[in-house]
Amino acid sequence: MKFLALLCLGMVGFAFGAEVSGLDMIKSYSIAGAVIGLGIAALGGAIGMGHAAAATISGTARNPGISGKLLGTMFIALALIEAQVIYTLVLALIALYANPFLS
C-alpha cells in the first residue's frame, strides 16, 4: 500500500517542480483524478465480477439443473458491473478533454 501511495504521489509530483499556471495545475489534477478514479473503478469491477462468477459456479455445483438461469443472470450482472467501469471511463475522458474548468 505504501508503494502504491508513493507511486501516485510520484506521478503527480512532477507538476510541482516548476512554476506553473493555474490551468496547468488543473490539467495535472484532472489527469491524476482520472487515473486514480479509473483504477479504483476497474479494481472494484474486477472484484465484483470475480464474486459474481464464484457465486454462479457455486450455485451450478449445488444444483446443475438451473445452470442456464444462473448463467443468464450472471451475464446480466457482469454487464451491469462493466457498465459502471465504462461510466467512470467516460467521466475520466470528459475530465481530460472537455474540462469545464479550463474554458
UniProtKB/Swiss-Prot annotation:
Similarity comment text for this entry: Belongs to the ATPase C chain family.
Positions of the record's site feature: Reversibly protonated during proton transport: 82
A single GO molecular function term of this UniProt record: proton-transporting ATP synthase activity, rotational mechanism
Subcellular location: Cell inner membrane
Keywords: ATP synthesis, Cell inner membrane, Cell membrane, CF(0), Hydrogen ion transport, Ion transport, Lipid-binding, Membrane, Transmembrane, Transmembrane helix, Transport
Gene Ontology cellular component terms for the protein in this record: plasma membrane; proton-transporting ATP synthase complex; proton-transporting two-sector ATPase complex, proton-transporting domain
Protein role: F(1)F(0) ATP synthase produces ATP from ADP in the presence of a proton or sodium gradient. F-type ATPases consist of two structural domains, F(1) containing the extramembraneous catalytic core and F(0) containing the membrane proton channel, linked together by a central stalk and a peripheral stalk. During catalysis, ATP synthesis in the catalytic domain of F(1) is coupled via a rotary mechanism of the central stalk subunits to proton translocation.
Gene coding for it: atpE
Transmembrane segments: 3-23, 30-50, 74-94
Pfam families given in the database record: ATP-synt_C (PF00137)
Superkingdom classification of source: Bacteria
Subunit structure: F-type ATPases have 2 components, F(1) - the catalytic core - and F(0) - the membrane proton channel. F(1) has five subunits: alpha(3), beta(3), gamma(1), delta(1), epsilon(1). F(0) has three main subunits: a(1), b(2) and c(10-14). The alpha and beta chains form an alternating ring which encloses part of the gamma chain. F(1) is attached to F(0) by a central stalk formed by the gamma and epsilon chains, while a peripheral stalk is formed by the delta and b chains.
Protein name per UniProt: ATP synthase subunit c
Membrane topology field: Multi-pass membrane protein
